[in-house]
Amino acid sequence: MSQEGITALRIAVDEVKSVITSLTEEEWSRPSGCIGWSVRDLVAHMSSNYKETVDPSPAPDEPINLPAERMMDLLIEPRKDWSNEEILAEYLAFCDQAVDVLASLQE
């Protein structure tokens, strides 16, 4: 990712934070632009990826040979029982750190 990409990602993260911190309960449940995913699922997807960037889970003993879409589902599934507040908290805890990790790879 280029420095311009990092700058754009920081802007996008800030815009997402602005939106998701003001969501109502009903808005969390609305369909997102991703077919089959709610806004909640989409935020869980982003937060799980940011968490994995900062604090990766241990590698599985056996390789997992799944399509990328199914791998993303596996990251979201454990969060199905989380409250919206827990998903929001995870996003806020890891989003800026994840951008910093990606930025450090450019140095």
Give short role names for the model-derived ranges.
Residues 1-14, 36:
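Short, extreme N-terminal leader segments that mark the start of a protein/domain
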Residues 38-39, 83:
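Short, structural beta-strand-to-alpha-helix junction motif
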